[in-house]
Amino acid sequence: MTVYLVRHAKAGDRDGWADDDRLRPLSGRGHRQAYLLVDLLADAKFDRILSSPYVRCMQTVVPIAGARGLPVEPVEALAEDAPLGDALELVQKHAISGALMCMHGDLMPMLLDHYASSGVEMRHELRWPKGCTWVLETDATGEVVRARYLPPPVD
């Protein structure tokens, strides 16, 4: 099956945000990216949508959830500063059934570096701009065997 790793879309400026960073929303551009992800991932096969509980991650996947009639499940293992082991365990848990997981720019490179150094076939150079997707393809046992990159949708 397949696990889709999505980095949250463009958020408002961190320096200009005085409130709790967990509450920082997407920017206007980020909202457009989130809606464009619906078409980009229209043929993707997954039955769960998991997200960091941070507002910007939840907002990134809400349009996909609405289009598919699926709930968005907030998961701390995808939050900023989450331990790599927790995220790896989450990917492994959902590798057979398929899932979309929205996360942050600190966790995504750690996951990708782990898979690259573990011998997973990386079909593209490692990068993780906001709104991008990495598609993790698994074998019948749920082991990640290939990863490919989908650039962020252009608005």
What does each model-identified segment do?
Residues A147-D155:
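Short, solvent-exposed aromatic-acidic interface loops
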Residues A11, L107-M108:
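Short active-site segment of divalent metal-dependent hydrolases/proteases
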Residues A79-V91:
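Short alpha-helix plus adjacent loop in nuclease-associated cores
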